[in-house]
Structure formats: C-alpha cells, structure tokens
Amino acid sequence: MIDIQLYKQSIDATSVEDSVYDDTCGGIVSFVGTVRNITKGKKVLRLEFEAYQSMALKEMRKIALSATTKWPIKKLAIHHRTGSIPIGGIAVLISVSSQHRADAFEACRFCIDTLKTTVPIWKKEIFEDGETWVSAHP
C-alpha cells in the first residue's frame, strides 16, 4: 500500500501512522517535519508552501515506488502540506512499515532526503521583519 497526499488542511499524524500499521511488521518509522520558530537567529512567524501539484504527486509516488524496490516495505505514506503553516504545525509526514526496523528507518530517510531534492514544492519563511524563499526544487 502506497498513500501519497498533498493538501492544505492539517496533517493528522496519528491517522497517517495508523494507516501503515500491519500486524506482519515489526517496525513502523515516521518522520514528522514541523515548523520551528527560529532560523539562523531570526524569529519565524510561519511557513508557506506552494507546489506544482500534479508534478509533486507524480514525483512523490516515484519516490515511494523506488523505496519499495530497495527495501521490503509493507506500507508507506508520504503526506505534504501546502499553504500557510503555523509554528509547530506539521509540514510533511512520512511513515513506513516493514518486517524489520532497519529497513523502515532506511526507507524513511531515503524518502525525505529524496523528496527535499526532487519534488517541486517551494517553501517561504515569514519572519517578523520580512520573508524569503528558502528552497526551490526542480
């Protein structure tokens, strides 16, 4: 099972993690990317994400399929949020289940690392004194 989603509403971490549960698996690993309140000494008010939706979903699915060929994954979910996200809000959640924890850890790391470099999602940091685009993927 592969579950790929990109949406504006809040990510429900418990629901996503529950969706990858499988009683044949001994490990579930999740990465939860949250909005922090400071970057390089500057106070962050919020983040804003924009995406080329159809391409982002396609690239996220490619990442998931690649992970399932590299590791024996039972279930995998990649959810990313767009729009304005407050401090403490979840921007991205990746959850992986596998029979063994090492495979789940490696697959989860691969997914977030690849997502950050290949998926067309752009992040803008909003500070007290201005804003800046901090990443632009191909």
Task: Label each residue range with its predicted role.
Residues M1-I90, Q99-R109, D113-P138:
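N-terminal, polar/charged subdomain of small-to-medium soluble alpha/beta proteins
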Residues S95-S97:
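Short hydrophobic/aromatic beta-strand micro-patches
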